[in-house]
Amino acid sequence: MIKGWSDVMVGPPWDDSSVSKTQPGRVILAGTPIGDRRSASPALIETLRDARIIAAEDTRRLRDLLRRLDVETSARVVSYFEGNETARTSELIDCLLDGDDVVVATDAGMPSVSDPGYRLVIAAIEHGIVVTSVPGPTAVTTALAISGLPTNRFCFEGFLPRKPGERRRRLGELAEEPRTVVLYEAPHRLADLLDDAAEILGVDRRAAVCRELTKTHEEVRRGGLGELAEWAREHARGEITVVLEGAQGTIVSIDEAAEMVAQLTADGLKRSKAVAQVARATGVDRHELYDVAQEALATDKEES
């Protein structure tokens, strides 16, 4: 068991009764607005105002948020982003052990959820340091709630790999996922992601593309992956969250399933694993699919 899981009492960040000068400080993960500043809670405003140290993903954006929230603070603001997260975590642990609370704030949403913060959380737990939060909105649950897709069971995939082959392999793994899938994507990669998803998951698989959530130009586009891929080529702008319908076990033709296997193996997945994934996702017989995929491979070799 990691040190600290069982012996740390966690209290709300605005209650100082459990902290004394001889105790370590606390890591406070501060959920910031994902767009509309009115989403900021009174607890967030108070925490930022009273903070002594704020570890910010982008110090300029943090100061802009403070200005928009009309918050004055004497906190020492330090940068804490992917490029310096490992080194800065050690420095912040020293501050925590000296008794200072450290507030972590990312550009938008909840720290450590596809954003900096996770390394500090683990390091704090290992040192027996309290980790708590000021809850705030996240694009994950906001997009899920308004997507129109099932919300009772879902999984979050963060950002898929940037490299096409790795991205396609990950989509192949998700082909059999029965839960609704939520993921993030950069606007300049959205069309490629949806093209790959349409090919691997099916052009008619339902999805929702949510952009600029809670902002003035918020938009939710719903439809099949094929039509959304076409739309994305001209309209992919802003912060993007994609929600994908889970696998329904829809049966496709054996030839279509064999083509899916061929694509997954071309992307580097072993044929046996590709066959198993496609069979579970489509409902075709695994043994029959393996034979057809093998025959198709032999035919391709003869023709080449």
Q: Which role does the model predict for each range below?
A:
Residues 2-81:
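Glycine-rich, flexible N-terminal cofactor/catalytic loop recognition
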Residues 89-138, 142:
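Glycine/small-residue-rich loop that forms an oxyanion/phosphate-binding "nest" at active or ligand-binding sites
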Residues 60-62, 109-110, 139, 189:
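Alpha-helix capping/helix-boundary segments
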Residues 48-54, 128-132, 180-181:
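Short active-site oxyanion
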Residues 2-20, 24, 101, 180, ...:
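A contiguous loop/helix-start segment that scaffolds small-molecule binding in enzyme catalytic cores
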